[in-house]
């Protein structure tokens, strides 16, 4: 029985062909005693030749399979790297989104944070004043001056700010810078005088603004609410009949502008006095216990100077504000805006006195 010559019918990749060709090429080396080629049919030893050829084929197929699997292995590694990189990027993006959401939450609570900051600053100013009152010095006066600055930033102060700016714009119209600043100083002195008189009165009476109970602060807050409603034209206040023929503007028109500003400052101090607690209550309490009018007047004057310092800064630019904002053109809005702030400030201070906050978390 003649053996069929070995032929390759399997399609292989290019790297596999040399190995397979080598396996199918006739061998020039002969086995001992045979002297024939591997591919030549023979009766004896044919099984050995077929086994050798089969082994060569299997080896070539194994090599080809490794070569074929290598691109798949590289592709698998590449895909795995991309997946890992994508996961890392997703983690970074997630962290950035969490950070941005945290910033958004911080932006949403910035109003509360700023309000808590002002409240904490006021409390710390009050504590600093209490510490400095134990031993008066020039440092004590500087601390009290700074406490006045902090108090001027309280929300309650906004209730009189539109009226103050409107008045500054009114008496600053058509006047030079020096006259405007002089009138503003007179206005501030009117504020300081009222609070200094309160200090002197407390020293003589032996009672403090903060020691007379809830009556005076609540009454002042209620007055602010009533005046705010009046400016908003919700309620109408009627003066007694003997004031019907009296025009305060006509009477004040005959006075110098600085005197008018001073008198206006006296009036504005009464409206702003509820905004000065608790620092003012601490000062007046100390003045009442010391029973020294000179010390009382000096401390209150120092405090009020710091309290009106922002007003003096605003007065320095009163002429520019007058030309840029044209207060007279928008004078119809002054009363409603002032009424809204007075109403809001009055309600705020009233609730603060009736329901004082025991703790404030930053």
Swiss-Prot record:
Residues 1-13 have a biased composition (Polar residues). Residues 1-63 form a transit peptide. One of its GO terms (biological process) is cytochrome complex assembly. It is found in: Plastid, Chloroplast thylakoid membrane. It is a multi-pass membrane protein. Pfam families: DsbD_TM. The keyword Transcription does not apply. Residues 21-40 have a biased composition (Low complexity). Signal peptide: none annotated. Residues 1-41 are annotated as: Disordered. One of its GO terms (cellular component) is chloroplast thylakoid membrane. InterPro entries: Cyt_c_assmbl_TM_dom (IPR003834), Cytochrome_c-biogenesis_DsbD (IPR051790). The chain crosses the membrane at residues 71-91, 97-117, 143-165, 185-205, 215-235, 268-288, 294-314, 331-351. This is Cytochrome c-type biogenesis ccda-like chloroplastic protein 2. Probably involved in the transfer of reducing equivalents from stroma to thylakoid lumen and required for the biogenesis of the plastid cytochrome b6f complex. Keywords: Chloroplast, Cytochrome c-type biogenesis, Electron transport, Membrane, Plastid, Thylakoid, Transit peptide, Transmembrane, Transmembrane helix, Transport. Belongs to the DsbD family.
